[in-house]
């Protein structure tokens, strides 16, 4: 059987890729929206990484950075942006929390989310709203309207952040993100996206969508492992604050002989990471 690759309102059939996965002939798996099977190549990479840790004398300084930079580059090509805008994160919640920490709000403003939206893109906003004394506006699909129309209709001058997915996980409904971005621009609202249910399956062009922040967990359509994901931050947020004051995101952290002397602020975005990077 083949797979469908969706490129904005049309599907392109591609040849069977069963040989790339560890899927027996008597199994037809159709629930990648829940969790994807790992590619054989990904399973091999995980195994190779585990074996490397079992022989730590083989680990070089380059291992801390080179594969991360390669992953950032490849993901940037998928969504049509620059690698300097991408960080590696452990979860969607981590990325959304980073966005919430770096976006400005104002008095009497509101954050717009969807009814039944996945909670990773809800709980951080509830906390922000409580701390800042602002409102959460939950949008459901209006009668005789698409979900896109319902979102756009609900964005007003008081809207400061629109935090939505591309695909609603409970129904599979698709949101036209460029249309939402246009409305956000009219009221000067920030756009934050959870693309876990769509990135890798739907063509996603950040040059067109222009999100402020976007987050993807890799265990669905990205065909990757748990506890890995990507965070996109638009250039205007590159001087923002990370959730953790890790040494590896400091300037000149590649020089392991001076890790106790890293007094500069976070590394240049183009060097490796922007706001966060999981490390001990």
Go through the PLM ranges and name each one.
Residues 11-280:
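Pyridoxal 5′-phosphate
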């Amino acid at each position: 059987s083949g797979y469908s690759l969706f490129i904005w309102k049309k599907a392109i059939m591609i040849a069977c890729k069963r040989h790339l996965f560890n899927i027996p002939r008597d199994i037809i798996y159709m629930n990648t929206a829940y969790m994807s099977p790992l590619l054989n190549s990904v399973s091999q990479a995980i195994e190779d990484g585990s074996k490397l840790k079992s022989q730590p004398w083989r680990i070089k300084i380059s291992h801390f950075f080179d594969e991360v930079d390669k992953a950032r580059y490849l993901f940037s090509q998928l969504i049509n942006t620059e690698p300097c805008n991408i960080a590696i994160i452990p979860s969607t919640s981590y990325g959304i929390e980073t966005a919430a920490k770096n976006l400005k709000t104002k008095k009497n403003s509101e954050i717009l989310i969807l009814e039944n939206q996945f909670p990773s893109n809800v709980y951080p906003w509830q906390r922000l709203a409580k701390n800042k004394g602002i409102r959460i506006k939950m949008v459901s699909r209006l009668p005789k309207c698409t979900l896109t129309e319902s979102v756009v209709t609900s964005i007003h001058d008081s809207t400061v952040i629109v935090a939505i997915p591309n695909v609603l996980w409970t129904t599979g409904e698709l949101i036209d993100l460029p249309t939402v971005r246009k409305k956000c621009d009219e009221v000067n609202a920030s756009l934050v996206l959870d693309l876990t249910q769509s990135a890798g399956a739907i063509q996603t062009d950040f040059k067109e969508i222009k999100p402020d922040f976007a987050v993807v967990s890799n265990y669905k359509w990205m065909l990757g492992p748990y506890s890995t994901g990507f965070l996109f931050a638009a250039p205007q947020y590159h001087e923002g604050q990370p959730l953790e004051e890790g040494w590896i995101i400091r300037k000149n952290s590649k020089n392991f002989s001076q890790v106790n002397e890293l007094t500069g602020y976070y590394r240049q975005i183009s060097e490796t990471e922007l706001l966060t990077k999981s490390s001990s």
